[in-house]
Amino acid sequence: MKMIRRTLLALLIAPALAHAAAAVDAPAPAFTAATADGRTVSLADFKGRTVVLEWTNHDCPYVRKHYGSGNMQSQQKAATAQGVVWLQVISSAPGQQGYVDGAAAARLNAERGAAPTATLLDPKGDLGRLYGAQTTPHMYVIKPDGTLVYKGGIDSLATADKADIARAEPYVTEALAAVAAGRKVEKASTRPYGCSVKYGG
């Protein structure tokens, strides 16, 4: 009987958590997180600047598509050159695919030529669950007033093939261009694709 009750409770909680995930055109959920280099940062630290959140897992084929081609690094560098804050988030739990400590995260970024503003370590999955991050990559764009204006895939082609990048619609690039121009993001919510975020139990 207890097991049945627990199952029913889980079924009731799951939709509530999904509904509580970050919503487009609403204030982005506030957070504080540890960085790979031992600092602590909060979303509030970047008030007045555009922020990108990128969920990542270096072992995921879909992530390797974008890093192996240089696409993710190019987007990071182009965005940060315009003053955008780019926060890479690792929500893989210890023992799960993609889990790394701070030193390993920094080494991976150096080896791949990645250029995020900071890498946030989220081994308990609190930040990932707060935003409803489902896949790696899963992308979010927050405009300077703190409003979430985009969430979803990095682009329109849900494959692990590097050759598809050139013909895909670059959703994140388009969202950032719209924010910079003071326009509404036309495709504000798209389907994320990639490996599931490897949360702990």
What positions do the PLM features span?
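Bacterial N-terminal signal peptides that target proteins for export
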Residues: 1-9
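Hydrophobic h-region of N-terminal signal peptides that target proteins for export
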Residues: 11-20
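Structural microenvironment flanking redox-active thiols in thiol-disulfide oxidoreductases
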Residues: 64-112, 123-128
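Thiol-/selenol-based redox modules, centered on thioredoxin-like
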Residues: 141-201
